[in-house]
């Protein structure tokens, strides 16, 4: 039996072993997935990987939690395996990755909670803690510290307001976002509006937790004129970001949108999206239609998508490498 089938067989047995009385165990999952991708002639990924890639994934997640009065604890343990073509990531002349790694690592996160078991050009296996946080929930206040996930913005596919760790727009599995090490706070007002704030600390390439690697953000979510709106003020990697967004009903459909302004190297950069969604139940089944337009102000104006051209645009390259942008 090859290593990949042996690992899959082990994953299949783990829920049986974990189904006993394990203190704090609050469920989990096993997911197996095959992903085939093809890249058009003008894609930067085609020069990297070729016309097509094929990958297999296995993901085990065990969720642990506990609470006492207003305090709580969460820890999610993961084992992730990947076999296929997308592991052999290209680097430039300085050893810089042109794409974020396909398997998660904690090289730049504040805490290193990932253990790489196997890593080569055809297979990878890691175990890690994707959630590890303590929290307090009051009548109008929520506080959490540790590894966790936060989602902001009104995008359904793309999301310029979600710059902490957004999903890849082409992601097949969007049940869990990768956790980031942060302090999160929320204060609920009597009107139903709320304030949310985050402080995310990361490390640089030397392993130092510096101010240049931080994200500090404050967002207000309010209601008015039969609509909801968001106001955002943030500093992300020493760049200021202002954002405005909202949603409103449009007949039986929902109209959403976000606009962000970023004080980048060469001046202010605007990114925006607007989407429309409509849901109904044909023959008793749920169905949804989504239309979304996204404008990436950091994108290239020309259709030259070679790695060399992308790396020449430092604002774009840094966001691609950090996993903030994917296109």
Show the residue positions of the predicted features.
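Outer membrane beta-barrel
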Residues: 64-194, 200, 222
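Residues on the lipid-exposed face of transmembrane beta-strands in outer-membrane beta-barrel proteins
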Residues: 60-66, 131-137, 183-187, 218-222, ...
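Transmembrane beta-strands of outer-membrane beta-barrel pores
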Residues: 32-38, 68-70, 79-83, 138-140, ...
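Outer-envelope beta-barrel architecture signal
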Residues: 21-30, 69-75, 139-141, 181, ...
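Surface-exposed strand-loop-strand hairpins of Gram-negative outer-membrane beta-barrel proteins
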Residues: 35-57
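Detector for outer-membrane/organellar transmembrane beta-barrel domains
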Residues: 253-327
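Residues that define the transmembrane beta-barrel architecture of outer-membrane proteins
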Residues: 52-60, 125-130, 137, 177-181, ...
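Transmembrane beta-strand segments that form the barrel wall of outer-membrane beta-barrel proteins
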Residues: 34, 167-169, 195-203, 218-220, ...
């Amino acid at each position: 039996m090859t290593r990949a089938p042996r690992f899959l067989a082990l994953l299949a047995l783990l829920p049986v072993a974990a189904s006993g009385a394990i203190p704090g165990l609050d469920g989990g999952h096993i997911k197996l997935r095959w992903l085939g991708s093809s890249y058009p002639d003008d894609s930067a990924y085609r020069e990297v990987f070729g016309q097509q890639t094929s990958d297999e994934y296995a993901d085990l997640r065990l969720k642990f939690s506990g609470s006492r009065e207003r305090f709580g604890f969460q820890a999610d343990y993961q084992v992730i395996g990947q076999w296929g073509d997308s592991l052999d990531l290209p680097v430039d002349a300085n050893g810089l990755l042109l794409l974020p790694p396909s398997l998660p690592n904690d090289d730049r996160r504040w805490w290193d909670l990932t253990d790489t078991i196997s890593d080569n050009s055809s297979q990878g296996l890691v175990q890690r803690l994707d959630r590890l946080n303590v929290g307090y929930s009051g009548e109008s206040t929520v506080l959490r510290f540790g590894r966790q996930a936060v989602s902001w913005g009104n995008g359904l596919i793309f999301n310029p307001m979600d710059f902490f760790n957004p999903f890849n727009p082409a992601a097949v599995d969007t049940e869990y976002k990768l956790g980031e090490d942060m302090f999160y706070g929320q204060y609920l007002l009597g009107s139903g509006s709320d304030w949310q704030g985050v402080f995310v600390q990361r490390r640089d390439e030397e392993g130092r937790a510096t101010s240049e690697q931080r994200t500090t953000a404050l967002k207000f979510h309010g209601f008015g004129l039969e609509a909801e709106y968001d106001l955002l003020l943030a500093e992300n990697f020493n760049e200021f970001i202002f954002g405005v967004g909202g949603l409103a009903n449009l007949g039986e459909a929902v109209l959403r949108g976000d606009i962000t302004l970023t004080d980048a190297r060469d001046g202010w950069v605007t990114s925006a999206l607007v989407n429309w969604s409509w849901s109904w139940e044909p023959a008793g089944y749920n169905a949804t239609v989504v239309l979304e337009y996204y404008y990436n102000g950091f994108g290239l104006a020309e259709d030259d998508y070679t790695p060399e051209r992308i790396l020449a645009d430092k604002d774009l390259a840094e966001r691609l490498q950090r996993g903030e942008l994917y296109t």
